[in-house]
Design a protein with these regions (language model features):
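Short, solvent-exposed loop/beta-turn-alpha elements that line the ligand-binding surface or hinge
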Residues: 144-156, 239-262, 310-316, 320-332, ...
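Glycine-centered hinge/linker elements that transmit conformational signals in sensory
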Residues: 209-210, 250-280
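Extracytoplasmic "Venus flytrap"/periplasmic binding protein-like
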Residues: 82-159, 163-165, 191-194, 200, ...
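Bacterial lipoprotein signal-peptidase II cleavage site
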Residues: 26-38
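A structural signal for short loop-to-beta-strand junctions that line the ligand-binding cleft
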Residues: 113, 120-121, 152-188, 219, ...
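Periplasmic solute-binding protein
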Residues: 131-138, 160-197, 224-248, 333-341, ...
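Extracytoplasmic/periplasmic substrate-binding proteins
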Residues: 67, 265-347, 353
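C-terminal capping/gating helix-and-loop segments adjacent to ligand/active sites or protein-protein/ligand interfaces
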Residues: 373-376, 380, 391-449
Length: 449
């Protein structure tokens, strides 16, 4: 019942008092004034209520799992998330990124979640055989129909499409193309040392390393285990050439053969010219050693460009420069980051919309310039790719460029083989037993095919 207004209370009290007086004396009542009239009914109505505020639309969400937490890559991811939110305002993005170069830590966390049946709504994997185990274990959905409805098949290079197609089906959406076979340096350091230019072969690098050591500097800055694996693939590529390098992953090149033995000898010598005993914690600190002049070179993929021009605010070909790693001119050792749709995703529809963002021209053109990569799509806006990225895009789309896949970044090796190789590499780095390493890798290859 509504609470009476003050005027109503006064009227009620007056009426009650009059009644009591009339019982005591009728004569007195007849001479008294008339009781106060009740206020009009309109005055007794309940005050009008303000209209209830309109309800906000119910929020959905999508959990996006990646390892993009470093400078450049984090900004790129955030740019793509912002674009996604502008197109899907009722979907919150849960950024579940886990720190660690090349996804070393993130992959361990992800595998635990997949084993427990608790997948994120979409997760990052490298395109290629890295995803093969998840496909075999029935952890991810077939996205072929999504490719057809979005018209993506006509927008991706054939080589990339082949790399992400397994038994005629496609299971991930690539957002970019990276190049692994690069060596980075600063022009001012080379000039100060009297070195005309970066080495074109690993033999030339070793010759330069002697001069560099004599000047009190380290020839090559190196990072943790995964960066050493990355270095191994570039030495193997430079020493064996693209065809025999590819043969290591399809069985046509013998790991225990003389050519591989010679390449591993070179790799051993390259390690001797590096700061392996005081290896940096990750690739960014290794790059910093080159910037401050403690080391002359570092071998790393082109995500380093995003770090140097973004976080470090440096200018390409003035403050830093890059070229194909020794022996690999004209070759593009590629890798690609891609996203999946796990089976059992809690927010499947939102996850599918995230994949559409990943595969869109706008999403890729926002992400890649900051990440330090080129778009997976062939119809991206080339004007957005300047400096090093303009060179990378030109090389990637050049029909004369020879394309090979990365070992360290999941294109050519499944997870089991890659893990066994990495274990053997860790032993080799300590023992320097090249023959033992080759035998262990050959055995692992045969066992994990």
């Amino acid at each position: 019942m509504p609470r009476p207004l003050p005027s109503q209370i006064a009227a009620s009290l007056a009426t009650a008092l009059m009644g009591m007086m009339c019982v005591a004396s009728v004569a007195a009542c007849s001479k008294s004034k008339e009781p106060a009239k009740e206020p009009p009914k309109e005055a007794m109505k309940e005050p009008a209520k303000e209209p209830a505020p309109a309800k906000e639309p119910a929020k959905d969400q999508v959990e996006v799992f990646s390892w993009w937490t470093g400078a450049g890559e984090e900004e790129g991811l955030n740019a793509m998330i912002a674009d996604f939110k502008s197109k899907n305002p009722t979907i919150d993005v849960v950024n579940a990124a886990v720190a660690g170069g090349a996804g070393t830590n993130a992959k361990a966390v992800l595998n635990t979640r997949l084993q427990a049946g608790n997948p994120p709504d979409s997760y990052q994997r490298h395109a290629g055989l890295e995803l093969a185990d998840d496909i075999k274990a029935d952890k991810v959905e077939d996205l072929t129909k999504l490719y057809e409805t979005q018209g993506w098949k006509d927008k991706l290079p054939k080589g990339l499409l082949d790399a992400i197609t397994i038994d005629g089906k496609i299971y991930s959406v690539p957002v970019n193309i990276h190049r692994a076979n690069l060596i980075w340096f600063t022009p001012k350091t080379l000039k100060a040392l009297g070195i005309a230019g970066p080495p074109k072969t690993w033999k030339e690098f070793l010759t330069q390393a002697k001069t560099i050591k004599g000047k009190g500097k380290t020839a090559l800055a190196i990072g943790p285990a995964w960066t050493q694996k990355h270095l191994l693939e570039t030495v193997l590529l430079g020493e064996l050439g693209p065809e025999k390098y590819t043969g290591l992953w399809n069985g046509t090149t013998d790991w225990k053969g003389a050519e591989v033995a010679a390449a591993l000898k070179t790799f051993n010598q390259v390690l001797e010219a590096s700061d392996i005993k005081t290896a940096a914690a990750d690739w960014q600190p290794a790059a910093d050693r080159v910037l401050d002049g403690a080391a002359v070179y570092t071998v790393m993929g082109d995500w380093q460009d995003g770090y140097l021009k973004g976080a470090k605010k440096l200018k390409f070909q003035t403050d830093y420069d890059v070229t194909a790693s020794p022996g690999s001119a004209g070759v593009y050792d590629f890798l690609s980051d891609s996203f999946t749709l796990p089976k059992g995703a809690k927010h499947r529809d939102a996850a599918e919309k995230w994949l559409i963002e990943c595969g869109s021209t706008q999403g890729q053109d926002l992400f890649n310039p900051q990440k330090g990569s080129v778009p997976a799509r062939t119809d991206a806006d080339k004007s957005k790719y300047t400096g090093y990225l303009a060179v990378a895009l030109k090389d990637w789309q050049d029909p004369a460029t020879k394309i090979v896949g990365s070992l360290a970044h999941g294109v050519v090796a499944n997870n089991a083989f890659s893990s066994e190789l990495e274990t053997a590499l860790g032993i080799f780095v300590e023992s320097r037993d090249a023959a033992g390493f080759a035998a262990a890798v050959a055995k692992a290859y045969a066992a994990t095919r």
